[in-house]
C-alpha cells in the first residue's frame, strides 16, 4: 500500500533541507511536495520505503511526523 508521509517543521529552512535530502537520495520530485506556507514536506512512498523516508525527514527535526494511506485525487 502506498503511504503519504508528512513532516511539519518549525522553519522553512528545515523543510527545504529535508526536501533537498529526499531529492538527493533519489526520491522523484513528482512524489514530493513542499508547502512553503506551513513548512511541511509530504512524500508519497510505497509502504516498504516508508521507514527510510521517515528517517530522512526525522534527521531534520520535525515538530510532527505522520503517515496515512495515500488517496488518489
Tell me what each language-model feature is:
Residues 1-73:
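Positively charged, small/polar-rich N-terminal and surface patches that mediate targeting and assembly
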Amino acid at each position: 500500500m502506498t503511504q503519504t508521509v508528512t513532516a511539519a517543521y518549525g522553519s522553512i529552512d528545515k523543510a527545504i533541507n529535508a526536501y533537498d535530502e529526499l531529492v538527493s537520495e533519489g526520491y522523484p520530485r513528482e512524489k514530493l511536495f513542499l508547502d512553503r506556507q506551513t513548512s511541511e514536506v509530504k512524500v508519497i512512498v510505497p509502504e516498504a520505503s516508508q521507514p527510510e523516508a521517515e528517517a530522512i525527514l526525522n534527521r531534520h527535526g520535525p515538530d510532527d511526523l505522520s503517515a496515512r494511506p495515500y488517496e488518489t485525487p
